């Protein structure tokens, strides 16, 4: 146990900290390599109590899970993991699917449609053009170009008919003359016919295509690459890149030997390659009497706790020569690259189905029938191969990963005691790429091969269901800690023990997500029906940290309230641009339900300088979360608690809160958070106004229930912070100035009322709510008005018509409808936009394709809207 004293660097002389640190927190907080000591009471196989370790580095390993086979293709041996950069060669055997489904070849799309296999592969480059008619009564035509490349994998989805244009030429002796001068169409009649098509999903382009039956070309139920792989010997990486798992292989020649192999692959053995897995491990060296014992800890399993040198924990300088000395010894006796390429047995003491806390929220073993698991594997293999082919260069078999600083204050790994919360979701989407497999302590999204790529983002915005095992005192301490750092965007649910809080540095280092090919509308439709976003978030960090780039506030996917049109609900739900921070998915963790002292609010206001110049993460994230209160709020929840919830202001539909009176009121809004404390209002009002200022999207659809005291306080607060309705001219100047400096929308309809007036004249600006939609929409005004009144041109107080601002992204749904009327669009188009709940943020993202194909607008209407978005305004 005692290192050799002759080395002059004895580990016994080091003073160790009394605070034990989990390994995942250690590697993300301190730079490696580091010396550590196993904490007392930790039981780790292969380690003794108080063992010294050199924590060498973090590595990202990509391995192929394989089963040993016997002659009859029965699984007989242990499950093993073969690194993707394993140097041995394999030869493909006859596959199980070749026996069940012999290889078929086709010479046209029509032959494919008759057989209708699950998938086909393109055996040659195919180009096909067809002239498609726009409609039965429309003379417009469009040339549809179809291009398929050799090796394209097509999943068959169904059949359909399209209208194609066919020309009937009149017999005339002038045809030759007209043909020479290019005017043959002048004496031709345009006809239409129906052409049967095969709808397929092209996995190379990630788009759906319609292949006419007339299209000729060679297709096969096996990939041409896989057919070419039948001959010769290949590396395991070559096999997984060019074939569809699972595949059966044999070892044709003696494989190379690795001193760290725990499973020996021998000549003549047969294996079934099942799937690909990527995991992050921490490689360590146990230091015993100048003897090095290498070992590793996967970060998706339970990790032990270690004690660190006390000087390191306190942030003081300490002799790093000790680390360099032991690192030199390790490098002499230990080859980490060889160690990373070793073949190992898969541990059987934990179930693969329980790796992800998101899959069933299992706390123990979750047994799934083998037939179901195999069927799921079969269905998702195309996704595995797609990810391997598209991101083939990212198949890291032995790449070092720098996790230092990955736990920033923006909501990523929280230092949970592992005996309290064994299953905890990650808060940083960037860590999903550092940990492609779900880790029960640090990563919450599974990236293992059982899940298709779409499903990685399926539960992005859903509240996590974690076991509530903490005591009440712990919860109170968490709330206090969270409240003290909320202005700095910290979301650590538990106080950091000891002095570790000072050592957790904020950093934006995160691996960029892989590029995602664009998807066609048909595939998006399928994803919409699955309630999964078709395109994952492009940014690993949900919030921009640069002050020059305003964060985009996007709307989460609606779970229960869908638009009548499935095509349009995709846009209004924000699925095409979703970026949900996980820190807000759990209202019990992110939403304060107790009043904080006013000095905390003041601290927030001072730190932010202006609630709009430098918005906090809370100001944005409160718009991104779908509050769990609406899906199951307790009726005993008081109205004051309801008022204090900072995420109660919406521009999208929400569910009716049970047990609350139908009384509507305007939401008070503060334009300068610093002056808010000057007014003699109650702490409840101040807190509520501060929380609403974090959600300045629209007060048109705001609080549904308040009591009279809160309403009166809000009116007083509103009169001190918001200009009254007459006159409106100063209001416009203020908005113009604010819009130039603020990345967040400042147009607040709830602040435009005269706070001292309760006459029905105020109903002119109110949003109309259909009777059938009462449970979805909640108007914030005390009265409801007919559609023709609320959609009428808004008066500014001096009789002039309402004019849209230069920046349209901050408009509410109501103001978008007024903008459309401002440019002269018809009422049916305006009501259509209202029905689809298009606000300014969605309006500026609309394209000509969306407006014409999905919204079914005419070319003139599309042109008007696009020019309006680009800055055009009609002259008055």
Swiss-Prot record:
Signal peptide: none annotated. Residues 558-572, 631-640, 648-658 have a biased composition (Polar residues). Residues 496-572, 626-664, 738-763 are annotated as: Disordered. Changing residue 453 to F: Does not abolish phosphorylation upon EGF stimulation. Abolishes interaction with PTPN11. Abolishes phosphorylation upon EGF stimulation. Residues 811-876 form the SAM domain. The modification Phosphotyrosine is found at residues 105, 453. Pfam families: CABIT (PF12736). CDD domains: SAM_GAREM. GO terms for biological process: cellular response to epidermal growth factor stimulus; epidermal growth factor receptor signaling pathway; multicellular organism growth; positive regulation of cell division; positive regulation of cell population proliferation; positive regulation of ERK1 and ERK2 cascade. GO terms for molecular function: proline-rich region binding. The modification Phosphoserine is found at residues 610, 614. On EGF stimulation, phosphorylated on Tyr-105 and Tyr-453. Isoform 1 is ubiquitously expressed. Gene3D superfamilies: Transcription Factor, Ets-1. Isoform 1 interacts with EGFR. Isoform 1 interacts (via proline-rich domain and phosphorylated at Tyr-105 and Tyr-453) with GRB2 (via SH3 domains); the interaction occurs upon EGF stimulation. Isoform 1 interacts (phosphorylated at Tyr-453) with PTPN11; the interaction increases MAPK/ERK activity and does not affect the GRB2/SOS complex formation. Isoform 2 does not interact with GRB2. Belongs to the GAREM family. This is GRB2-associated and regulator of MAPK protein 1. The gene is GAREM1.
């Amino acid at each position: 146990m005692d290192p050799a004293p002759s080395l002059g660097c004895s580990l016994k002389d080091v003073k160790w900290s009394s605070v034990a640190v989990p390994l995942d927190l250690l590697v993300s907080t301190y730079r490696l390599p580091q010396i550590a000591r196993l904490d007392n009471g930790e039981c780790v196989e292969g380690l003794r109590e108080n063992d010294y370790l050199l924590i060498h580095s973090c590595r990202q390993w990509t391995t192929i899970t394989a089963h040993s086979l016997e002659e009859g293709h029965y699984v007989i041996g242990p499950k093993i993991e073969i690194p993707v950069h394993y140097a041995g060669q394999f030869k493909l055997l006859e596959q199980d699917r070749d026996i069940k489904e012999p290889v078929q070849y086709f010479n046209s799309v029509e032959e494919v449609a008759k057989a209708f296999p699950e998938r086909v592969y393109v055996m040659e480059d195919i180009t096909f053009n067809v002239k498609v008619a726009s409609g039965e009564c429309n003379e417009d035509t469009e040339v549809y170009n179809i291009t398929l490349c050799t090796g394209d994998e097509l999943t068959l989805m169904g059949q359909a008919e399209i209208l194609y244009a066919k020309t009937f030429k009149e017999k005339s002796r002038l045809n030759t003359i007209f043909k020479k001068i290019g005017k043959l169409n002048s004496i031709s009649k345009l006809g239409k016919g129906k052409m049967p098509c095969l709808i397929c999903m092209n996995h190379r382009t990630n788009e759906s295509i319609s292949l006419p039956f007339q299209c000729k070309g060679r297709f096969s139920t096996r990939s041409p690459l896989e057919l070419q792989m039948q001959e010769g010997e290949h590396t395991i990486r070559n096999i997984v890149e060019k074939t569809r798992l699972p595949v059966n292989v044999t070892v044709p020649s003696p494989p190379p030997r690795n001193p760290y192999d725990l499973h020996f692959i021998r000549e003549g053995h047969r294996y079934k390659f099942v799937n690909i897995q990527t995991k992050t491990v921490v490689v360590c060296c146990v230091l015993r009497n100048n003897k090095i014992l290498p070992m590793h800890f996967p970060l998706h399993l339970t990790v032990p706790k270690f004690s660190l040198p006390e000087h390191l924990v306190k942030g003081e300088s300490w002799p790093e020569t000790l680390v360099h000395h032991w690192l030199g010894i390790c490098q002499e006796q230990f080859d980490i690259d060889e160690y990373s390429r070793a073949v190992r047995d898969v541990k059987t003491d934990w179930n693969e189905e329980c790796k992800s806390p998101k899959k069933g929220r299992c706390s123990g073993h979750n047994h799934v029938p083998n037939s179901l698991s195999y069927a799921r594997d079969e269905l998702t293999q195309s996704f595995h191969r797609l990810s391997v082919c598209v991101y083939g260069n990212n198949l890291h078999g032995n790449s070092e990963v720098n996790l230092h600083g990955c736990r920033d204050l923006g909501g990523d790994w929280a230092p949970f005691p592992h005996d309290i919360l064994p299953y905890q979701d990650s808060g940083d989407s960037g860590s999903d790429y550092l940990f492609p497999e779900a880790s029960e302590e640090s990563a919450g999204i599974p990236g293992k091969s059982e899940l298709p790529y779409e499903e990685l983002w399926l539960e992005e915005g859903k509240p996590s269901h974690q076991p509530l095992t903490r005591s009440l005192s712990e919860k109170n301490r968490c709330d206090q800690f969270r409240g003290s750092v909320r202005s700095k965007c910290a979301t650590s649910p538990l106080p950091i023990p000891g002095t570790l809080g000072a050592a957790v540095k904020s950093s934006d280092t995160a691996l960029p997500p892989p590029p995602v090919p664009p998807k066609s509308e048909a595939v998006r439709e399928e994803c919409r029906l699955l309630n999964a976003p078709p395109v994952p978030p492009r940014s690993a960090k949900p919030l921009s940290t640069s002050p020059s780039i305003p964060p985009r506030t996007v709307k989460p996917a609606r779970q229960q309230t869908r638009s009548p049109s499935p095509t349009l609900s995709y846009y209004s739900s924000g699925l095409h641009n979703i970026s949900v921070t996980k820190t807000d998915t759990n209202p019990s963790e992110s939403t304060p339900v107790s009043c904080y002292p006013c000095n905390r609010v003041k601290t927030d206001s001072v730190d932010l300088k202006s609630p709009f110049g430098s918005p906090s993460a809370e100001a944005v994230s409160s718009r991104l979360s779908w509050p769990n209160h609406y899906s199951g709020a307790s009726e005993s929840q008081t109205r004051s608690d309801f008022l204090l919830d900072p995420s109660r202001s919406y521009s999208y539909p929400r569910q009716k809160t049970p047990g609350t009176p139908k009384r509507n009121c305007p939401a008070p809004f503060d334009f300068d958070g610093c002056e808010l404390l000057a007014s003699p209002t109650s702490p409840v009002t101040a807190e509520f106004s501060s929380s609403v200022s974090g959600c300045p999207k629209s007060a048109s659809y705001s609080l549904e229930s308040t009591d009279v005291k809160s309403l009166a306080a809000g009116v007083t607060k509103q009169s001190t912070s918001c200009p009254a309705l007459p006159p409106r001219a100063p209001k416009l100047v203020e908005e113009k100035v604010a819009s130039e400096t603020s990345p967040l929308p400042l147009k607040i309809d709830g602040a435009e009322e005269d706070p001292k007036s309760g006459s029905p004249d105020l109903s002119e600006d109110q949003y109309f709510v259909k009777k059938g939609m009462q449970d979805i929409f909640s108007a914030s005004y005390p009265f409801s008005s007919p559609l023709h009144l609320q959609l009428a041109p808004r008066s500014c107080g001096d009789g002039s018509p309402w004019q849209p601002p230069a920046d349209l992204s901050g408009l509410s749904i109501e103001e978008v409808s007024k903008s459309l009327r401002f440019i002269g669009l018809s009422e049916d188009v305006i009501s259509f936009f209202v029905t689809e709940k298009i606000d300014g943020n969605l309006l500026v993202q609309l394209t000509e394709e969306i407006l014409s194909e999905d919204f079914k607008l005419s070319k003139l209407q599309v042109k008007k809207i696009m020019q309006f978005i680009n800055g055009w305004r009609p002259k008055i």
